[in-house]
Amino acid sequence: SIRYALEKLGHPLADDVDLDWTIGPPLKGSLARLLNSQSDELAEQALAAYRERFAVIGLFENQVYPNVAETLCKLKQQDYQLFLATAKPTVYAKQILVHFELDQYFTEIHGSELTGERTNKADLIAYILEQEQLNAQHCVMVGDRQYDIVGARAHGIDTIAVSYGYGTPEELAQAQPITQINQFNELIECIEQLNQQRKVS
């Protein structure tokens, strides 16, 4: 969808350009960087073009990582409340989770607004804590990018990094999560250990 947007604006990308880094941070800023432009208007045009394709096709060009559904199911059975915190617009995030039948495991799905509010992960987490009346000391953030880890830590939330996502090892190490998992099903044991540590302290 990014390639579609830039091509539509007359700024096609070479096939070998890596776009993995665009997953995680606010998309409008990433588009501006790819366009090498300070123009807010141009970035908005690119964002609109991106959504043209993403809303119809790009939404479903995903694959669920192994063990995700089973792990989410077990966590829900153990009475954990699960909230999604994504920089994607909420309307798209909900469609994606419904498509992959993962929505059933989440208490609520929180993302950004199409108008641009809450694309910053720390702002989004603050919003979720307030809306859901959550105690940050009782929460855990699981993420694969520095934005997840740093955004959660800004609110005193313990963080678990996922090594197999879009964040590089260097990026995740610099973000300083409390621990890291290499497979999603390791999350259950990881949370159990964290709960034990919290009881001790």
Q: Each PLM stretch: what is its role?
A:
Residues 1-69:
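N-terminal helical cap/lid subdomain that shapes the substrate entry/recognition surface
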